[in-house]
């Protein structure tokens, strides 16, 4: 009985598998921006999951050359050769053959699916939906970053405009005061009180309507 070959196609190969991928790869742009800014997630849940993943020991299959090497080492040492786990040509009992006595064998059917093709189609559909969700999240994050940068620029422009206005008003006050002092000195009756001078209120400020007397 020949082993059936499974041909896995690309996610975007089928037209009817789901919605088409967006023309702009926002996820790739987000990854490039993350690497450029050297951003790393430090959420406790992600760190715990990463620690568990690194501590987990994955069962790797034993290479076929190891039993032969153990036999040669046993012969060189003068000891009895170590027998392999199974004889040559003897196949390990599969789970399907072991469970034949318990329940009847259902050929060509998987749990929850009628065939392997149906399972592959479902898996392809799930992967397509996950890719679209990743693209949407990446697009939202990129848009949010753009909005934040726009707000920062607007705030900086407002501060710069306010600074320019203050400098302009200060120059105008100096020019007006210089003209007044050159003509005739201000009388003490027209000068403002000391508390107003301490907080920066002058006659020129009042004339320019920058402060309210109410």
Curated annotation (Swiss-Prot):
Region of interest: Disordered: 1-26, 59-108
Keywords, in A-Z order: Coiled coil
Listed InterPro entries: FAM167 (IPR024280), FAM167_domain (IPR051771)
Pfam family, one: FAM167
Cleaved signal peptide residues: none
Residue ranges of coiled coil: 118-156
Tissue specificity statement from the Swiss-Prot or TrEMBL entry: Expressed in skin, including primary keratinocytes, spleen, kidney, leukocytes, testis, lung, small intestine and prostate.
Family: Belongs to the FAM167 (SEC) family.
PANTHER family: PROTEIN FAM167A (PTHR32289:SF3)
Name of the protein this chain belongs to: Protein FAM167A
């Amino acid at each position: 009985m020949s082993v059936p070959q499974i041909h896995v196609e690309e996610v975007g190969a089928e037209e009817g598998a789901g919605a088409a991928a967006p023309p702009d790869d926002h996820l790739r742009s987000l990854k490039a921006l993350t690497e450029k800014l050297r951003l790393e997630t430090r959420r406790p849940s992600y760190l715990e999951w990463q620690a568990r993943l690194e501590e987990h020991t994955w069962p790797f299959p034993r290479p076929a050359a190891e039993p032969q090497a153990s036999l040669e080492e046993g012969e060189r040492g003068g000891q009895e050769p170590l027998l392999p786990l199974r004889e040559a040509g003897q196949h390990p009992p599969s789970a399907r053959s072991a469970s034949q006595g318990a329940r009847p064998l259902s050929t060509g059917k998987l749990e929850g699916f009628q065939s392997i093709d149906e399972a592959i189609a479902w898996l392809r559909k799930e992967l397509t939906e996950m890719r679209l969700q990743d693209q949407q999240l990446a697009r939202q994050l990129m848009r949010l970053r753009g909005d934040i940068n726009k707000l920062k620029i607007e705030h900086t422009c407002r501060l710069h405009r306010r600074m320019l206005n203050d400098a302009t008003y200060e120059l105008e006050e100096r020019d007006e005061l210089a003209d007044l002092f050159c003509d005739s000195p201000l009388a003490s009756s027209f000068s403002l009180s000391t508390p107003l001078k301490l907080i920066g209120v002058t006659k020129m400020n009042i004339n320019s309507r920058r402060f309210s007397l109410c």
